[in-house]
């Protein structure tokens, strides 16, 4: 590199470093952009003189560089423009120029061509056209740059451009779905992100409007308050993106788990642990994108209406205060929301009641939103407002859209201060993927869908139950309040009771309705906990559950709320296995509350008789049946449900000395049930678990049982890896059975491979502290319940089983609850040694070492 260019490069590096240092000290986005852009332009000036002195070409900054918004590791968008088609020599010259840019580590993105060629290239390319919309002359022939800008603007169909940018935004938002996009959002492309701000400004610029906020204010596109909010939201997002680039040292626009704590710390969130720093950063981020979405709801239709060829304007009278304009509702006088604040809810009530109205007219929305910022205690105390707010839930129609609209514009938080505390609040527990407010509204949506015929195909039984449930509005309210006390420290289910009862008292609920609402909030985790962590075949478990529930109404409401809550936590959590667990508990509890099935001896006897009837119909002699029952022992009927007993009996009755493996695909499920019967021996359970893990199966439940003649009868429910289609299941089943058969006959040893304990990025950087509790079982000496919470990973259950074996603890039952990347496992174990506190402490310590 020539000496003069080396000097220019060194100057650039000093200016770039100075811009970064100045930014980290002063924290001013606009100053950083100005200084860093100037540094790049200084280097480009030297390179241009070296390659194109006295040339007819011109160099233009386009895209982000063109608008002067250059982030530390962003591409430098450029266009080399010629008044005439490029000769081979000029093209080679441009190629050398671009290579020099790469040598200088500028990450260039360069378009080149004549004015005509470049205009033609963007004619059907909305991205290219957008880049040139922000073109800015740098060096060379200014006349060529002016000609390009003039022709680009002349050929642009503004209405088509606006429509294309809005469609592009819709597609971008649609892609930003799923747990990855929520937990590690792309600050540039997510809904409400920087690209949405750019889109608004592009639409304005294409119409010939100035795109700096003061000018948009003068042109009455923005109000003063809106300009301030948009500027604040933009600066927040730009701050985060600058720090993200500086910490990642690359053009990374995703707030990855491993970068969140670094970005938070560099932005000054000090005095907090890494998790709290990350949560605070993400809360700031979510509030910023919420502001952008709020303003987009007003500005997008307003800007679009300036150029779009709208259908014939149809205006209908609604009442003295409102008219309908096409599918929007408009206030006759927009100051009505300030003069008569009760109309803040009234217009929403009208919109909820009428399916032909889908939105507020932009100027009405602007006035309404401005008035909502005046919501205070006196607004809440107005009985008319409280009646209307409760009416949103009683009506039910469009409830999800209504609540999301009120949340987007901050009304829920102003009306209910408890709600404001959970807006944008993230939970780093490895299974929730939404901020608390979004999660709650998703749960409300799920409950509401159960009430609608059009969605009955999703969950037919639950939908039928919901549609016959009399107090649907209380269920909606329970969904709304179930997590409202998150983030306060302590038990949110208990703390939420007071919020629910206060709301009920203020919003004219009856005592009976208030009691049901408060009970559901307090117990919203009860059913999922019992179904996923406890042995619901154990009559004592069912008895304790039903003593908490007490009535069929509570049982139905809790079942519907639990389904909706799990489905609204993380799409990965809901599966056929969880559905069957909840449904089994629901039906068992229903029988118990009706007076059927509560006596343990009656229950065990019925299970045994059902199996005996099956074997008798299969012509199995009674003598042979008794031999089987004696081998299994009476405890067997306490630990297994009827369907398992029938399956085991049919496979074992003719020969209960020969080891066997059997499996079956569970109906309407992506899971296998597997039984393994073989002589007892050391570490068998752990080694079986390793086989399942090696095949990529998630173990959903496991029941370890030892017969009277010292055989193991272990039963597993395992989930098939998600990449397999149902038509692959028989082949997968055959391969699994083949390896298990080889194992039980002593031909293979199932051991772990060295590379299989890898965990996700989320689990590495947002881990949960493992916890272990060991509790003696009442009325059963030497039996214990072991509860474990830890980061989920391959071979976890096998490793824990190894620890139990090493401490002479016999594992008899395992209930596995895998919540995405979090494992909450329950074990029933037998060990006289655990009476010794030292041995119990040693077991805990070894388990913790294995889990950490």
Swiss-Prot record:
Residue ranges of domain HD in the record: 436-558
Alphabetical list of InterPro entries matching this protein: ACT-like_dom_sf, ACT_dom, HD/PDEase_dom, HD_domain, NT_sf, PII_UdlTrfase/GS_AdlTrfase, UTase/UR
Keywords of the record: Hydrolase, Magnesium, Multifunctional enzyme, Nucleotidyltransferase, Repeat, Transferase
Family: Belongs to the GlnD family.
Uridylyltransferase, as annotated region: 1-318
Catalytic reaction(s) noted: [protein-PII]-L-tyrosine + UTP = [protein-PII]-uridylyl-L-tyrosine + diphosphate; [protein-PII]-uridylyl-L-tyrosine + H2O = [protein-PII]-L-tyrosine + UMP + H(+)
Lineage: Bacteria, Pseudomonadati, Pseudomonadota, Betaproteobacteria, Neisseriales
The protein's name in its UniProt record: Bifunctional uridylyltransferase/uridylyl-removing enzyme
The protein's Enzyme Commission number: 2.7.7.59, 3.1.4.-
The ACT domain, residue ranges: 673-757, 785-852
Function field: Modifies, by uridylylation and deuridylylation, the PII regulatory proteins (GlnB and homologs), in response to the nitrogen status of the cell that GlnD senses through the glutamine level. Under low glutamine levels, catalyzes the conversion of the PII proteins and UTP to PII-UMP and PPi, while under higher glutamine levels, GlnD hydrolyzes PII-UMP to PII and UMP (deuridylylation). Thus, controls uridylylation state and activity of the PII proteins, and plays an important role in the regulation of nitrogen assimilation and metabolism.
Comment field on protein domains: Has four distinct domains: an N-terminal nucleotidyltransferase (NT) domain responsible for UTase activity, a central HD domain that encodes UR activity, and two C-terminal ACT domains that seem to have a role in glutamine sensing.
CDD domains linked to this entry: ACT_ACR-UUR-like_2, ACT_UUR-like_1, HDc, NT_GlnE_GlnD_like
